[in-house]
């Protein structure tokens, strides 16, 4: 959602939507999450949000800070095609990881236990967040997703995710 003041909507705004047929037969939603499931993250956090914030504020954090915006369909499709019983998938956009996990936990009626040390945040993102007083776990990503699935399938799912460039940094975070 993009909200702009009246008369301030100069420039180009692009909106997209997808229409398709679900052929996998899985119920992929927070209501499918079960106690003991693994939480997989497709890569490092916060690059998109910090890139946008730094550009808007005219700040520079070195050469490497760039958006993580990327298409996720190949990575997700690889896991689904392999027959892994994915319980929930969510993109890590508005509100970052914490908002996404809170939504899943609340909808599922469960709590989520994370290993914070396993959550990847690049040093330049961590530094930018520190300078601006932000928590990198609450910063938006545009090319990252969470997959919640049975623990016995986590290694296979990680292998498939890591085989796709966009999710080469996939890891188990909880």
Regions found by a protein language model. Name each.
Residues 1-174:
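Helix-biased detector of long, well-ordered alpha-helical tracts
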